[in-house]
C-alpha cells in the first residue's frame, strides 16, 4: 500500500487559517516566518516520524497564496517504492 505522507493547503490569511485548523481540529500550527516563505507547519498527530506514528495520521503545511505561483490548491504527497513503476501504473489506468 502506498500511503499519503504529507499534505499542503494554500491560505490568504495565515493567522486566520492557523487559528481555524487549531480550533476546529486541534492541530498544532508552527509559523516558520518570512525566512521560510511564511510556511506554516501543521502537526496533526502527537507523534512525528514513522516509529510510534498513529496509523493513518499525516502532517502537512499551509502556504500563502501568491499571484505568480501556478499551483494554489490543496495537494497531497503519496509515498511510493518505485516511482517509474507507479508512473507506468498511472498511465496504464488512465491517469495523467
Regions found by a protein language model. Name each.
Residues 2-6, 71-75:
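Short, solvent-exposed beta-strand edge segments and adjacent coil->beta transition regions
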Residues 31, 65-66:
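Basic, gly/Ser/Thr/Pro-rich low-complexity segments located predominantly at protein N termini
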Residues 8-57, 92:
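Core segments of cupin and vicinal oxygen chelate
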Residues 1, 54-56, 68-70:
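A generic structural micro-feature
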Residues 46-49, 68-69, 83-84:
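Short, charged/polar surface micro-motifs in flexible loops or helix N-caps
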Residues 23-25, 66-70:
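A solvent-exposed interaction/effector surface
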Residues 12-15, 75-96:
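Vicinal oxygen chelate
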